[in-house]
Swiss-Prot record:
Documented activity regulation: Allosterically activated by GTP.
Family stated for the protein in its record: Belongs to the UPRTase family.
Keywords: Allosteric enzyme, Glycosyltransferase, GTP-binding, Magnesium, Nucleotide-binding, Transferase
Residues binding 5-phospho-alpha-D-ribose 1-diphosphate, per UniProt: R79, R104, D131, P132, M133, L134, A135, T136, G137, G138, S139, D200
Protein name (record): Uracil phosphoribosyltransferase
Gene behind this protein: upp
Organism of provenance: Streptococcus thermophilus (strain ATCC BAA-250 / LMG 18311)
């Protein structure tokens, strides 16, 4: 079973409280999502492998540690997931970025995939799927399904807020993946929104309705 972790660092929790506020501007919302994603990246990347390397300091030659060169991929779920990419990418600039686009069918209310653009060697990469919200779990499950169909096996799901219903649904569908969030909220309301949540992350990121 993959792990589920709430990253409760004080800086993350402080910024998340501002992010939730109804009066937070689009500009500030965008910057906060970027900052929280970067801070979460510290914990999400904790198990990246290291290797020893000999370097020359101004004083002496020494053996130190660096990332082993394991291939990474950041895969945001469009469109809101885009807001998390740059923050995480600033920590691992060599990572490739793929995209999975979805829309919600108005009749079935289920997510429908309309775009998949991934690195050719996605099956060889450690993948970080990003979406600010894990609500019903439908989009997350479809995204992981899509990645696994293409041979991906090492997948982590990273979100800012999650509903218990969505976490359970994703764990039931894909018990092997790790899930990271900055907050496990109370529940979903009758419209499928996370409570207390932060509203529609895509609209708030891009200033749309």
């Amino acid at each position: 079973m993959g792990k589920f972790q709430v990253i409760s660092h004080p800086l993350i929790q402080h910024k998340l409280s501002i992010l939730r506020r109804e009066d937070t501007s689009t500009k500030d919302f965008r910057e906060l999502v970027n900052e929280i994603a970067m801070l979460m990246g510290y914990e999400v990347s904790r198990d990246l492998p290291l290797e020893e390397v000999e370097i020359q300091t101004p004083i002496i030659k020494t053996v130190q540690k660096q990332l082993s060169g394991k291939k990474l991929a950041i895969v945001p779920i469009l469109r809101a997931g885009i807001g998390m990419v740059d923050g995480f990418l600033s920590l691992v600039p060599a990572a490739k970025v793929g995209h999975i686009g979805m829309y919600r069918d108005e009749e079935t209310l289920e997510p429908v995939e309309y775009l998949v653009k991934l690195p050719e060697d996605i099956d060889q990469r450690q993948i970080f799927v990003m979406d600010p919200m894990l609500a019903t779990g439908g989009s997350a499950i479809l995204a992981v399904d899509s990645l696994k169909k293409r041979g991906a096996a090492n997948i982590k799901f990273v979100c800012l807020v999650a509903a218990p219903e969505g976490v359970k649904k994703l764990q039931d569908a894909h018990p092997d993946i790790d899930i990271y969030t900055a907050s496990l909220d109370e529940r979903l309301n009758e419209n499928g929104y996370i409570v207390p949540g932060l509203g529609d992350a895509g609209d708030r990121l891009f200033g749309t309705k």
